[in-house]
Amino acid sequence: MGASVQERDRTRLVLKQSIKNAVLSHQKVAEAINDDVVENISSIIEQIINALKKDGTIFWCGNGGSAAQANHLSAEMVGGMFKEKNEPLKSLCLNVDTSFITAWSNDNSFNSIFTRQIQSLSSKNDIVIMLSTSGNSENLILAADYCKQNNVTVVSFTGNDGGKLISLSDYNIHIKSDCTQRIQEMHILIGHIICAEVENYFK
């Protein structure tokens, strides 16, 4: 037999409370974005604008859900966020070339998939934006270290304690949370803000 009306009602109440808790958790993390974080976001926007004015490229990369967000935000820069037909901005996501990534990972190392592409594609006016909830992904650490040694600007979005990536970054957005979902929600929010403000500048 199916659940009784009372059981279904109880299940629905539990579900509603769970949804409310998730929203409240999101709000709490969002409200922790203080003036220091806003200052960092402003600096990153200025750096991206300066890079694009010098014909630089904005590269994005990440792993897992952060890879999806990197792809999303790169697409926002190329395609534009608004209805106006603005000029496309030079942006490329480094985790979408499946042929290269699978070949290089199979024959060499997954840890160097981003470093290799940055070696091939980057120049002094470029910026590499790395998204990582932990800040400890080895392929990002190695890529950031390469950038540091070769004067390529690194911007990182991190969470948890920031990991090793913070010290290798020229600019960092750190979300003080240990919940992966909340961290990624803030990353995409801030990424959208950055893309929108950069696009507005070049209207």
Residue spans for each PLM region:
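Generic N-terminal amphipathic, Lys/Arg-enriched alpha-helix
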Residues: 1-36
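Glycine-rich phosphate-binding loops that contact phosphosugars or nucleotide phosphates
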Residues: 66-203
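Hydrophobic beta-strand scaffold residues
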Residues: 58-59, 154
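Structured helix-beta-strand junction loops
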Residues: 29, 54-55, 124, 168
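A short, well-structured juxtamembrane/interface segment
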Residues: 36-54
